[in-house]
């Protein structure tokens, strides 16, 4: 009897300490102006940043993300932003050709084409749209992916995308801290001159680039985090750090939140990020807007399997009514 009571007390003590133990770090605060439902966003950067921005755009927040495709290195990213601000049109000299295909090292392979005229026109349309939206934007979301990048061997020019060209054409380089900061300080000074009210949210992608090993990946991420903090210190009232990198790698710390390659973030990890943003970054009105937008989005995503005409008509009326109410309340045009 005494033996059983002793062990029950030990078990109770163990459970008490287990319950009292802290097994996860707290989610970090976001020291940045709240996201409002009236904001216009412009996203630029890696695939992780693209996924976050797309979540906002799909919720009918006006804006644009990566008009020239995903981009990972901070210097080509600054070059893209500068060209968008300048609205400097593309000319035929901006494009290369390979086996009847035309492309630019400035943009993603998705913008390639077999007609130089069509490719140039597409680039200039994207450029004009991006310029218009950027100058109206209230939030710029930048996501740096890696500090390893590529320069053209002949000119030393940083490229946004190697366009699957032979490796011999490029030099793979690790950008210096001063080079990164000089590019971005100058770029942001220009941005704040043409759009004084814009707020810049900068984050570092938690996606691992492990081609050269974990040590090189960590070296790269450290350089990017250093750059971000330099920019925040230089523009303390206009540039803000969003610690999504720390959320994935320091708070969650679990491969359940990664894809099968153990490098990219999966849908569960992205959902954790969005839940964190809702709690820490969304204004109260934005949170209400988000819930309403999700209802509308779910209606659009809903696939009708019924063949009953009356049921289909009823669902269509419900959707139209909900969309009309949403548009009227939030001044949208869905």
Feature map (PLM): residue ranges:
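Extracellular glycan-modifying ectodomains
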Residues: 12, 17-334
